[in-house]
Amino acid sequence: MTADAYPKRRILVVDDEPLVCDAVKMMLTFDGHVVQTAHNGADALALFNKEKFDLVITDFLMPVMRGDQLAAAIKAQNPKQPVVMITAHAETLQASQTPLTGIDALISKPFLLENLREAIARTLPVEQV
């Protein structure tokens, strides 16, 4: 899927590693999206409560609030809000008995830009694509 294959979106990227946030922001900005970043779940939730985002992309393990906790808090406010998780722990989480509540797509780190584009296309509601 090419960058022009879907509309441009407002995306919130959450990761405690600034380099990861910057890399994902650069990839998504290259595709024309408007991207904001946060470095923990609590800061992300505060941003989410102030602004409207078409998509939230979050890491799993972060200080203050994990990504699954952030997703649950977001879905409690807006059940239709798409949330994608990017994590180095994808295989462990998928094998776990505990379901990832509120996660619409899971991407394993490291990942390719194409994986991210596909997750965006899959998770956004049809009327937005």
Model-derived regions: residue spans:
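Receiver (REC) domain active-site loop signature in two-component systems and cognate sites
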Residues: 62
